Regions:
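Outer-membrane beta-barrel porins/channels
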Residues: 1-245
Length: 245
């Protein structure tokens, strides 16, 4: 269990470079989120040993409480997310058509872990740099109002992979995790199609989203082990209904 809180700041601006044109340029910078967190965990190991004389199983229980004076094992730490940079372009034609595009960059290898006294963690930070990389995100969308109350929408979103090809699950010798499998997700593509209605008191939106991405699956870490290619696809339909008073 992890509890805590964090704070970040966002700065941005929108510029219209041409006075008589609806074309606009937007830029924004999101600072890292600075988290102060506390982790609590406990472990229980139960072992059954056959007793052939009594034909029964003897049970042995080892509980982490036995080593931590009856309390959860835990510690305080700090976590800092990467900076995020965004550039957007937008254009409207009259009151019936609008199109916009965005580019976003965030380097996940720059995330940082430290103890409550500020000392950098010696395992988590090098592992993040070794396994993760910068992510490029592109978004583009358009809306066409057939009539003032009814609109068609179309969108596309591309997000590059956050994991390097050589990434693996680096379980420490004292890890409480029992799962060894892992999958390195590749680029993600999202396609959306929607319609919307805006009345004086009632509004409705209906959207369909199709997402697909590939990943390399490994049951455990072994340099000689061949990957399994997996393709993930998902379809989603979303509807919003509302009333204005």
């Amino acid at each position: 269990k992890i509890d805590g809180s964090g704070v970040d700041f966002k700065f941005g601006a929108i510029v219209r470079p041409f006075e008589d044109s609806p074309f606009r340029i937007g830029v924004s910078v999101h600072t890292p989120t600075f988290y102060n967190l506390k982790i609590k965990t406990n472990v229980r190991a139960v072992t059954y040993t056959p007793d052939f004389d009594s034909k029964k199983l003897s049970e042995a229980v080892v509980d982490s409480y036995d080593f931590t004076n009856g309390v959860d094992y835990g510690y305080d730490f700090r976590f800092r997310t990467p900076w995020k940079y965004n550039l957007s372009l937008g254009y409207t034609y009259g009151s019936s058509f609008a199109i916009g595009a965005e580019y976003e960059y965030q380097d996940y290898s720059a995330m940082h872990f430290s103890y409550s006294d500020g000392e950098a963690m010696g395992w988590q930070n090098p592992t993040a740099k070794e396994m993760l990389k910068g992510v490029n995100t592109f978004r583009i969308g358009a809306e066409w109002k057939v009539i003032p109350q009814f609109a068609f929408r179309l969108g596309y979103n591309y997000m590059s992979a956050a994991f390097k090809k050589t990434a693996f699950k680096d379980l420490s010798y004292n890890s409480i995790n029992t799962d060894t499998d892992f999958a390195n997700a590749k680029a993600n593509n999202n396609y959306t199609l929607g319609i919307g209605y805006r009345g004086s008191t009632f509004y409705a939106d209906l959207a369909y989203m199709y997402s697909t991405y590939k990943e390399d699956f490994y049951p455990f870490d072994d340099g000689a082990l061949k990957k399994t290619d997996v393709t993930n696809s998902r379809s989603k339909v979303m509807m919003t209904l509302g009333l204005r008073f």
